[in-house]
Amino acid sequence: MNRYFSLRDEVLHLLDEKSHGYYKREAIAHMFQVETLCVLLAKERGLDEELCAIIGLLHDVAVPIYSSSFQHATRSSELAKELLGPIFSDEEKKYYFHCN
């Protein structure tokens, strides 16, 4: 789970810089609720829990960062590619980058 904690900290730092007030609080709540559901599904289906937690964490990451839901799936995917960088294998990255 080291990769998860590193990415979580980076995402929270981005939110501190780019998002504010109620919108930021709602985004953080949504992010962690979806992450929790992803981990529960991973446990139930025997999937990689760390990878699923990260998918939940990043699934809508662009919405609070850009303060817009316009093309949020594509924008979140692009932002996730930047955040994930070289720490994930190509096999792992393909699960997140489904919308491209």
Task: Enumerate the predicted regions with their spans.
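Metal-dependent phosphohydrolase cores
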Residues: 1-100
